């Protein structure tokens, strides 16, 4: 298989990952305003898509962390090769699609890093091909600290918002004015998501071009066509709406009120924007989840569903190693040459087809997002359900837990 064809296939696969990142992470910006009724579902995701598109053009610091820092190299060469980039993307896409199907808000970013790390180590048989200082300083430590920081900021902001408006307690309109603020704050989250997450795919494609000798290693910044393609891919994915994960963040962790949602969104946006300028490739999903939990704790009459929170945390812990294992396995197959690459591509296509076919059997759409569309979710880490002709509905539980089978909405 020619190098040019491999590069084209990997670029297509990278843009598909960017697309999945869009619908997987739509919830980060729009789950809480949809939950409180500040925005209707379809206009919300359209707004998020437009702002993700704009945000992708605002910075390239995170892209350079991936293309010029994580994978070691010598001179104009890097340890990773185009087939290994393909293998890493298969690992990332596999975990991204599975967690989306299970309704678990896991990290698309860590799935990508895990896939690339596993593919590089197995493909080169050299654990030293990874720059662990960059891995720890720019990825792992921010991943551990960012949800805690965002949660503390959201907790404090929620307390402050309720204290400042305490005279409105008991009124019919209560704190509904915060719904207007949510439109602004959720827009800021969507913009910041574009500045952070779109860059990760830009970095992967740039890394691919460097590994193929099509771009000097000293020029780690993405080319203009890479920026444009990634911006369009993530915006398109965002517009499709990741309704399963929107439901988990909007309903499954805590009952979200307008003031609380506003505090969570502003905390999320502030954390993401600050990290983007510092080149930290953190997970916007973890930040958003931490903010929602913090805001739930900040409300005196609020509570957090710790069972759901625990399953989300388990998903966070599994993301990087599982994606690395899949990336490593596909990298070992890629070592077979052209036949190995074809097998890897077939694996990717099979995973994509199976996941979307299962999703089609029990779809979650924008119709399920309105406040009265369905009964409150007992545990929004949703099990998959499908009906076979003549059979009772069977539940296929996710690794995140089987309690979600209690949610049985009508097929749209």
Walk through the language-model features, giving the residues of each.
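Multi-pass alpha-helical transmembrane bundle typical of ion/small-solute transporters
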Residues: 1-412
């Amino acid at each position: 298989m020619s190098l040019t064809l491999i590069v084209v296939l990997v670029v297509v696969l990278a843009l598909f990952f960017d697309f999945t990142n869009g619908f997987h992470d739509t919830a980060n910006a729009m789950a809480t305003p949809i939950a409180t009724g500040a925005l209707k579902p379809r206009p919300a995701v359209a707004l998020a898509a437009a702002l993700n598109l704009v945000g992708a053009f605002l910075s390239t610091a995170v892209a350079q962390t991936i293309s010029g820092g994580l994978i070691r190299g010598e001179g104009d060469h890097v340890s990773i090769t185009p087939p290994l980039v393909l293998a890493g993307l298969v690992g990332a896409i596999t975990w991204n699609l599975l967690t989306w199907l299970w309704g678990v808000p896991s990290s698309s970013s860590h799935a990508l890093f895990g896939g690339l790390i596993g593919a590089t180590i197995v493909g080169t048989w050299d654990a030293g091909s990874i720059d662990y200082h960059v891995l720890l300083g720019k990825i792992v430590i921010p991943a551990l600290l960012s949800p805690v920081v965002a949660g503390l900021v959201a907790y404090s902001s929620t307390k402050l918002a309720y204290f400042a408006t305490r005279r409105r307690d008991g009124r019919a309109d209560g704190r509904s004015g915060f719904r207007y603020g949510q439109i602004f704050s959720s827009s800021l989250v969507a913009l910041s998501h574009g500045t952070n997450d779109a860059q990760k795919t830009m970095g992967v494609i740039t890394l691919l071009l460097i590994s193929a000798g099509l771009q000097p290693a000293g020029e780690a910044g993405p080319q203009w066509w890479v920026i444009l393609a990634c911006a369009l891919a993530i915006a398109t994915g965002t517009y499709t709406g990741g309704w399963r994960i929107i439901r988990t963040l909007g309903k499954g962790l805590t009952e979200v009120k307008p003031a609380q949602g506003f505090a969570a969104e502003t905390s999320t946006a502030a954390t993401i924007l600050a990290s983007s300028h510092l080149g930290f490739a953190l997970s916007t999903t973890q930040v958003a989840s931490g903010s929602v939990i913090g805001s739930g704790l900040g409300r005196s009459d609020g509570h957090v569903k710790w069972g759901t929170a625990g399953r989300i945390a388990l998903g966070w812990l599994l993301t990087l190693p599982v994606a690395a294992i899949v990336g490593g396995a596909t990298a070992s197959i890629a070592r077979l040459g052209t036949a190995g690459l074809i097998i890897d591509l077939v694996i990717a296509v099979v995973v994509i087809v199976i996941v979307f076919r299962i999703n089609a059997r029990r779809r979650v759409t924008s119709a399920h997002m309105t406040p009265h569309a369905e009964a409150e979710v007992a545990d929004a880490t949703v099990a998959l359900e499908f009906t076979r002709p003549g059979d009772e509905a069977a539940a296929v539980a996710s690794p995140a837990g089987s309690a979600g089978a209690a949610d049985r909405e009508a097929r749209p």
